[in-house]
């Protein structure tokens, strides 16, 4: 959704410049070939004869010079699952220990600081090869000049979805750009040095290994983060974490006794077990094995005496440890039984589960609180949704949190009964299904999403995962359909014809597979409202159109009617005489960040054109939501939650990229936002 210098236009590219061999052409012509002139630039929603112009594009990724340094600033949003650098385990050691596994939403500026790409050289978010909420799979290219910069590409030609606008990269022939060692991006690294985090944008186009790769497990630790230093070459004692606590304590106490006994003979080597931190002592066990000087020199008689005493102490320690372990195990069983009984009688805590697995469910206090928001109303036919942290391959190191998805679903179920996803990577679909099950949302339905890319590896992986999800489902009635690609034609740039051929091929492949497996699900795609044509409609089982009045520079007083008129004149006629479903796949309004005056029109003041703000959002909601509910219009609202990381796409005067949510990233309804209750009427 949105991007740098985004506008609603049929003529210019994303840099707002015409090329030397181009001239401005408006597609809105009268019967006499005269050009329309409207208050919204080139766009007239009443003109049925509009024909979209081909969109220019520049190819490829750029790369970062290998000597480029990285700047690190990061904090965590209060109330989130993450631990920040101020907490024990923050920073690189925390990442090495998996602290980021439960990463929740970072604040916008800090999320941006985790990327090592200057804002001025970032492509717009809707570049074909960028990661956005509707593209959590393919990363943004870093700075460099191995490939042409997408900044040279022109303004977008139309409104968009929830990724930023930018140059379209090639879609033709399912090709993957080749690379040479000099073209390798630092983003391809699986660790990315000390700046790696769950919000970094990595390249998915190369599997090369780099000398800059840093394995956090290999970094020397000075212990100042509160965790004990694990010695090189030492056996990993962390696997013993599940040993009953009393048994471990008994063993540590025995080791401490041995250490004190040796001290009587003035031995200098440290005890292999004695430490105030049991974990640290265990971790250092093998350090003492490098030189076994427990008895040392002296008379043989004294050696025998010491040996006999030590043998007796060791036997006593073994017996004591065994007894302690048995008693501890019995006590542990008793505590577990008592805890289970208490849990079953009084419910679980805010972070607990009645299943005892640490995962939230409908009986968790936190979930009960989230599902009891009187300011939310189930009036949206559908909501676009991308779980947090599902960028591949980064999610392999920092998996998204099931509890975060469950929290999101607890909120979303108060807004809608239908959710749309954009891809299958990183188990996002499985986590949504798990959340639906844990919350027992029997009325919730899901539109499956598949991300289509020029990189055939990405596309094949996504489609393969789609097949697994559907075939492994106990009941496919929860699925409403499969959306193969989002705005693949727009991102194809001028090579739209080849892109359309490839896209139709993917759609047909999925349809054939479902037919062979006796799976009855509609298959189609979603794209800009003016990118649909008869050929694509013929291949798809439904038509999904992304329509955003904000980027047309439409004033808020006209936004609702403009959206309806545009949809009715551009898209619904394509399915006349068929039973194919028509759906607006994205529509919304930002809550702040400036104003947009449409194609080729620079706003003269901050009140002109489409103004982002809470009041404007409320007006659009009040004039669109209940009316659509009454007339049965099918649409997906973009979007429920802010995405702070998209602050990197903001530009002066156009700072709305991270502000499209009804709620902030912590799932709090934004102050002043009023979701209509439509007189108590809800989506069925």
From Swiss-Prot:
Top enzyme category: hydrolase
Major localization listed first in the record, in broad terms: membrane
Chain segments carrying region Disordered: 1-38, 124-143, 157-182, 330-358
GO molecular function, one term: glucan endo-1,3-beta-D-glucosidase activity
Intracellular or extracellular location(s): Cell membrane
Superkingdom classification of source: Eukaryota
Extent of Polar residues compositional bias: 1-10
Residue intervals on the Extracellular side: 324-684
Protein topology in the membrane: Single-pass type II membrane protein
Residue ranges annotated as Cytoplasmic topological domain: 1-302
GO CC terms of this entry: cell surface; extracellular region; fungal-type cell wall; plasma membrane
Keyword annotations from UniProtKB, A to Z: Carbohydrate metabolism, Cell membrane, Cell wall biogenesis/degradation, Glycoprotein, Hydrolase, Membrane, Polysaccharide degradation, Signal-anchor, Transmembrane, Transmembrane helix
SUPFAM superfamilies linked: (Trans)glycosidases (SSF51445)
Active-site residues from the entry: 487 (proton donor), 586 (nucleophile)
BP-aspect Gene Ontology terms: cell wall organization; polysaccharide catabolic process
Bias kind Basic and acidic residues: ranges: 12-32
Transmembrane segments: 303-323
Reactions catalysed according to its record: Hydrolysis of (1->3)-beta-D-glucosidic linkages in (1->3)-beta-D-glucans
Function of the protein: Glucanases play a role in cell expansion during growth, in cell-cell fusion during mating, and in spore release during sporulation. This enzyme may be involved in beta-glucan degradation. Active on laminarin and lichenan.
Family (UniProt): Belongs to the glycosyl hydrolase 17 family.
Protein's name according to its UniProt entry: Putative glucan endo-1,3-beta-glucosidase btgC
Lineage: Eukaryota, Fungi, Dikarya, Ascomycota, Pezizomycotina
């Amino acid at each position: 959704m949105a991007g740098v210098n985004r506008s609603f236009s049929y003529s210019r590219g994303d840099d707002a410049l015409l090329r030397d061999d181009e001239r401005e052409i408006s597609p809105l012509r009268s019967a006499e070939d005269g050009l329309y002139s409207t208050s919204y630039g080139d766009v007239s929603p009443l003109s049925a004869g509009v024909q979209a112009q081909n969109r220019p594009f520049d190819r490829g990724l750029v790369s970062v010079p290998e000597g480029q340094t990285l700047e690190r600033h990061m904090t965590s949003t209060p109330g989130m699952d993450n631990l920040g650098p101020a907490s024990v385990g923050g920073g690189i050691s925390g990442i090495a220990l998996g602290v980021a596994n439960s990463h929740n939403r970072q604040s916008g500026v800090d999320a941006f600081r985790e990327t090592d790409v200057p804002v001025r050289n970032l492509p717009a978010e809707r570049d074909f090869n960028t990661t956005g909420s509707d593209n959590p799979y393919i990363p943004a290219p870093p700075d460099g000049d191995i490939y042409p910069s997408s900044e040279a590409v022109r303004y977008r030609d139309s409104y968009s979805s929830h990724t930023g606008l930018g140059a379209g990269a090639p879609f033709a022939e399912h090709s993957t750009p080749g690379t040479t060692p000099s073209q390798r991006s630092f983003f391809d690294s699986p660790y990315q040095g000390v700046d790696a985090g769950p919000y970094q944008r990595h390249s998915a186009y190369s599997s090369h290994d780099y000398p800059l790769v840093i394995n956090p497990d290999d970094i020397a630790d000075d212990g100042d983060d509160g965790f004990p230093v694990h010695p090189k070459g030492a056996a990993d004692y962390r696997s013993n974490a599940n040993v009953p606590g009393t048994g471990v304590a008994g063993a540590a106490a025995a080791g401490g006794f041995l250490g004190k006994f040796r001290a009587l003979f003035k031995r200098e080597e440290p005890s292999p077990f004695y430490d105030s931190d049991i974990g640290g002592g265990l971790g250092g066990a093998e350090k003492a094995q490098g030189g076994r000087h427990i008895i040392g020199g002296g008379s043989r008689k004294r050696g025998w005496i010491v040996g006999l005493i030590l043998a007796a102490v060791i036997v006593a320690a073994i017996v004591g440890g065994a007894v302690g372990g048995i008693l501890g195990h019995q006590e542990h069983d008793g505590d577990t039984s008592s805890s289970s009984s208490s849990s079953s009688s009084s419910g679980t805590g805010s972070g607990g589960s009645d299943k005892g697995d640490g995962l939230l469910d409908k009986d968790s206090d936190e979930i009960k609180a989230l599902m009891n928001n009187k300011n939310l109303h189930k009036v949206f036919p559908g909501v676009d949704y991308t779980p947090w942290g599902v960028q591949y391959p980064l999610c392999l190191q920092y998996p998204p949190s099931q509890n975060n998805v469950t929290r999101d679903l607890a909120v979303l179920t108060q807004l809608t009964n239908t959710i749309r996803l954009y891809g299958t990577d990183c188990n996002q679909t499985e986590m949504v299904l798990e959340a639906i099950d844990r919350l027992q949302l029997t009325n919730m339905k899901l539109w499956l999403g598949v991300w289509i890319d020029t990189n055939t590896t990405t596309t094949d992986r996504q489609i393969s995962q789609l097949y697994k999800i559907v075939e492994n489902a106990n009941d496919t009635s929860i699925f409403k359909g499969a959306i193969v690609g989002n705005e693949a034609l727009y991102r194809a740039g001028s090579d739209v014809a080849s892109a359309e051929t490839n896209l139709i091929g993917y759609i047909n492949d999925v349809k054939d597979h479902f037919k062979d497996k006796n799976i009855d699900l509609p298959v189609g795609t979603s794209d800009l409202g003016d990118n649909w044509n008869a050929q694509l409609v013929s291949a798809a089982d439904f038509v999904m159109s992304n329509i955003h009045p904000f980027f047309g520079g439409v004033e808020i007083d006209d936004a609702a009617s403009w959206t309806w008129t545009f949809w009715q004149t551009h898209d619904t006629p394509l399915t006349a005489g068929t039973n194919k479903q028509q759906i607006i796949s994205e529509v919304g309004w930002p809550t702040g960040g400036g104003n947009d005056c449409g194609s080729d029109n620079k706003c003269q003041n901050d009140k002109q054109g489409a103004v982002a703000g809470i009041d404007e959002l409320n007006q659009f909601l009040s004039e669109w939501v209940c009316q659509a509910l009454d007339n049965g219009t099918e649409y997906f609202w973009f979007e429920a939650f802010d995405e702070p990381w998209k602050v990197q796409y903001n530009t002066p005067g156009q700072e709305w990229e991270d502000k499209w949510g009804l709620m902030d990233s912590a799932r709090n309804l934004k102050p002043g936002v009023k979701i209509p209750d439509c007189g108590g009427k809800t989506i069925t």
